[in-house]
Amino acid sequence: MTATTTAQPSGPVPPASPTAARRLLLVHAHPDDEVITTGATMAAYAAEGAHVTLVTCTAGEEGEVLVPELAHLAADREDRLAEIRVVELANAMTALGVADHRFLGGVGCYRDSGMMGTPANDKPHAFWRADLDEAAAHLVKVVREIRPQVLVTYDENGGYGHPDHIQAHRVAMRAAELAADPAFAPEHGAVWDVAKIYWTAMPESVLAEGIQALKEAGDTSGFIAVESVEDLSFGTDDALVTTTIDGTAYMENKREGMRAYPTQISMGQGFFALSNSIGMEFMAHEFYQLVKGAAEGSDTGLEKDLFAGLGIADGTAAGVSQG
């Protein structure tokens, strides 16, 4: 995958009324977040015939640029990185087999806020500064159109404390609440109550195994190996993890999706790194914490299906429409 591409950034036009029995909505902060934490999940459900919708809240304008010949596009220079990241996202969606992708409020409605405490937090249209209900209203339109039984977003800390991730969490949770409220914006469509809500998770035990694997791998082309989980800004207590999706059959889709982001992700043999150069192991399994709905465990104690317990194998909808 090279840094230049001819893919069209607008992406395919999403269907107005999905007819798939299973409908999954994911809300992420920036292009590349979706493939790193949920790529195998998205590919798996898309391949199985579920309607998968991705809503990305910003175009990642403040991201660092790992491709030297594109460094001039960075926010502190020409400020045109969004042009590339939108195209990278379109290519990643092709790799994952996902046709329905939207930007919250449309491309450019909200800007990447940068890391916490930086001047980018206060730029015009920074997502971190967005009015919560106004931003949530954009997502309510999507929820009532798609009628997802399952919603995936981040935990209260946004996974690792990035302001856009925290805001994505707030907007997603507020939108789920408002979409079920008959008094809120009836012009946005019939009321819909999402049956199950998950937050992405990375069990501390799995992180520890990945750190050890990187150490044992030796030279990994400049990737930094941290000493312990405590050195990372993220990680979920294993006791909070309720669900795991086995993405083994879709790892190549996930890898190809990650290769679609040359400006953001450095790829290695079995490992990858972002701009901080900290090596992370490719994960065949992706993990979640169920925060709304009832978990349906297995002999391992973890759910194996985001739609478990919803009774939609026969094609009946499990969400609640009140319109």
From Swiss-Prot:
It is an enzyme of class 3 (hydrolase). It catalyses: 1D-myo-inositol 2-acetamido-2-deoxy-alpha-D-glucopyranoside + H2O = 1D-myo-inositol 2-amino-2-deoxy-alpha-D-glucopyranoside + acetate. InterPro entries: GlcNAc_PI_deacetylase-related (IPR003737), LmbE-like_dom_sf (IPR024078), Mycothiol_biosynthesis_MshB (IPR017810). It comes from the Bacteria. GO terms for biological process: mycothiol biosynthetic process. Its EC number is 3.5.1.103. Binds 1 zinc ion per subunit. Keywords: Hydrolase, Metal-binding, Zinc. Zn(2+) binds at H30, D33, H165. The keyword Repeat does not apply. Its cofactor is Zn(2+). One of its GO terms (molecular function) is N-acetylglucosaminylinositol deacetylase activity. Belongs to the MshB deacetylase family. Catalyzes the deacetylation of 1D-myo-inositol 2-acetamido-2-deoxy-alpha-D-glucopyranoside (GlcNAc-Ins) in the mycothiol biosynthesis pathway. This is 1D-myo-inositol 2-acetamido-2-deoxy-alpha-D-glucopyranoside deacetylase 1. It comes from Catenulispora acidiphila (strain DSM 44928 / JCM 14897 / NBRC 102108 / NRRL B-24433 / ID139908).
